[in-house]
Every structure is written in C-alpha cells, then in structure tokens.
Amino acid sequence: MRACIVNYNTPRLACAAVLSLWKHTPGVRVTVLDNSDRLAIRDSEHWAGLVSSPLVEVIDNTKGQIVDWKEFLGRYPDREPSPGNDYGSAKHCYSVQWLSDYVGEPFLLMDSDVLVRRDVTEFFLHPDCAWVGQTGENVKKRFGYDIQKVQPFICFLNVPLLQRHGIRYFNGEYMWNLTSVRPNHRYDTGAWLLRACREAGLQGHELPIGDYIRHLGHGSWRGRPVADFLSLNRQLWC
C-alpha cells in the first residue's frame, strides 16, 4: 500500500500525518512531493528520523526542480487573479497528477494537515472503483463554486484504471481561476476527477472520511494553530 502527500510549508503537520498513518496502518509506503517555498522538509527537525526510513520518499520541488510554477502559470495567460493563495488549488491538483504519473500505481492521497484516526486498509479494498472516498459540495459554495467533487483530504485513487480511461486529476480547462471562461473556473480540487469518472461510467466507493481523519484544514499553510491541533490530537500520532 502507498500513500502520497503534497506538502506546502507544513513540515510539522506532514510529519504527524505520516506518523498517524503508520500508527493505525503500519507499513504503508509514503511519497511526499515538497512544494514548500519557506519551510522545506529537508530543513525540518521533525523529519530527521523519517527521511531515512525505507518507507519514505521525499521529492524536493522547493526550487522548482520538478515543476516550475512560474512556467506552469504562464500557460494560462487569461487566468483570473488568485484570491490570496497564489493558485494553490491548481498547483495542488497538478501536483497530484504529477504524483499519479510518477508512482503509476494505486495510492491513498492525503492532505498534509490530516491525522489518521483508524486503519485505512478499507480504502484499498475496492479494485473495481476509480476512487474511494467521499463526495461533497465545494467548500467555496458561498462564492458560487458549488460543483460537486471527491473530497481531496483523504481519498484513494486507482491510478492504473484512471490511466486506462485517459482520466487525469488535473484539467486546466476545468480548474477555478486558471481560465476566465465560465463555468470552468468553478471546478476546485477533486471536481474534475468526479465529472470525468462519471462521464466514463467509472464507479467510485463512498466512505465517510470523517470516521478516518481529523483535519486542521482551511489554509493550514497560513500558520493556523498547528501546535494546539497536534497537542489536542497527540494520541493519534504519538
């Protein structure tokens, strides 16, 4: 079993996420794409013992070695202004697609700011499904972004099945803020995946993700109370 995490300036949270995963489901291989521009995993004391584990692979993109974000955004000259997160949703979706192409196998996608509460093996037990997780409306519904999506906080992606059907997690024509053409810009993280799977006739499997994770969420990279969150949920990762 493999899990993949996209990290952006949250090394302490990402470390706790991995430890919580292993506490409840030992032996899962973990691949992390580090997109940090300030708090890199390689400089984090919290990762000192993790990076040497044979179960962990950290891919350093802190200098644009893998994905040059300036070049990436340059592909979308008519994009709308970013609402304060520098096109974070688009970058995250593209990072997930990069990881999918890189590992080429099914994996559990986890946000860097979730803590696993229980064994996640159930996510891997539906080989005929394109995804396993929970659908829901966009959290940006109050801004008119109401297209349904597969929640990205924790979900299983059956990469070989998606690849056979030509389905990609990232689609720049259906990614909010990358194009000014409505309604395409209303698609947030996981929304294109759900639409593409439905159009291809691929099934997903619903699981109540709140039973499996605790999520700091909503801009944790902005410096929300990380220490308090980790302290209150210490039993999940220590």
Which role fits each region the language model picked out?
Residues 1-19:
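N-proximal low-complexity "stem/linker" segments adjacent to membrane-targeting elements
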Residues 20-28:
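Short, acidic, metal-binding catalytic loop of nucleotide-sugar glycosyltransferases
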Residues 27-39, 59-64:
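Short beta-strand/loop segment that forms part of the nucleotide-sugar
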Residues 43-102:
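Active-site-proximal specificity loops/subdomain of glycosyltransferases
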Residues 104-115:
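Short beta-strand-to-loop acidic/aromatic patch adjacent to the donor-nucleotide binding site
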Residues 118-144:
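Conserved donor-nucleotide/metal-binding helix-loop-beta segment in metal-dependent transferases, i.e.
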Residues 148-162:
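Short glycine- and hydrophobic/aromatic-rich loop-to-beta-strand nucleating segment
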Residues 154, 163-237:
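Catalytic core and acceptor-binding pocket of nucleotide-sugar-dependent glycosyltransferases
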